Curated annotation (Swiss-Prot):
Belongs to the bacterial ribosomal protein bL27 family. It comes from Janthinobacterium sp. (strain Marseille) (Minibacterium massiliensis). PANTHER family: LARGE RIBOSOMAL SUBUNIT PROTEIN BL27M, RIBOSOMAL PROTEIN L27. This is Large ribosomal subunit protein bL27. Gene3D superfamilies: 2.40.50.100.
Amino acid sequence: MAHKKGGGTTRNGRDSESKRLGVKVYGGQAINAGGIIVRQRGTKMHPGENVGIGKDHTLFALTDGKVAFVTKGALQRHYVTVVPA
């Protein structure tokens, strides 16, 4: 007869894959049309001039240019704009 006890069980051992969210192109950097600027959940940042928004709230450039981050309005919302080169 073996003298080893049975191994216990655990309810841990799972983790979700990271979603790689965040700012991909920073202020002052050049970007091409269609390039992703910010990946986010919800509208932490809003699209400004020459910036579009995808169905998953991704902000992307509509024209070539330089990225600029602006805070404006009574609610101090963060807007992302692309200044044409």
